[in-house]
Amino acid sequence: MEHKTKLIVRGGGDLASGVIHRLYRCGYQVLVLECRKPSAIRRKVSFGEAVFDGISSVEGVTGRLIEDVSECQKVWEAGEIPILVDETGKVIKELRPDALIDAILAKRNLGTTREMAPLTVALGPGFEAGKDVDFVIETQRGHNLGRVIRKGSATPNTGIPGVIAGYGKERVIHSPAAGIMHNLSQIGDIVEKDQIIAMVDATPVYASLTGVLRGIIRDGYEVPKGMKIADIDPRKEQKKNCDTVSDKARCIAGSVVEVLLANGVLP
């Protein structure tokens, strides 16, 4: 049987999904490993939402939740992307991927090692290229976004979002209390500054600025105080882009493909 290049991507959030989408379009067979309760904000472009809904779609590409790694082939043959809940990566040895991409973006290493695959790549800070993984991709907005790092680490997490239309930290909303999310606004809605967009139990969540609600954690999600729960884009004209892969994700995805091709991992 002809060998098809198999890749594992750890993580199914919006940046990870930009990478997954690009790899799929390039002809790779991709398995996505997710956690039990994904906390994606940009849910319309996150394959990990399949963990809750059984199925997800990003720009016409379908992700499908599976219960066992043995189901991968059937899903691949259907032209879809299998998504498996596996927080520790225990199926990696069983599948023996040609390459592994850590796209969890936890700002720290949650257990990925170079021994997991012939080629290993990690996105963002928390990894040292040449030690923890073979390559690291810079994820911080700015001149070096998407840079392939062969030795050393990505820029440490500053906790300050990249500036868009003059707004940085104001774009991101954190939970004012611990509790259950009750969303009053939906992704793509135009919201006004100080508008109540959600409730965390009885505590209101206010829009930090006027713009388009680019993302909000799913309704019913239990959040701790201080957790990132929403993202507002001050550019109202970006409403049409809430359900498409971002420029940042596409840039990072291109760098991952560069690493694969440069190291002989062809589709």
Located regions from the model:
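Well-ordered secondary-structure scaffolds
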Residues: 2-267
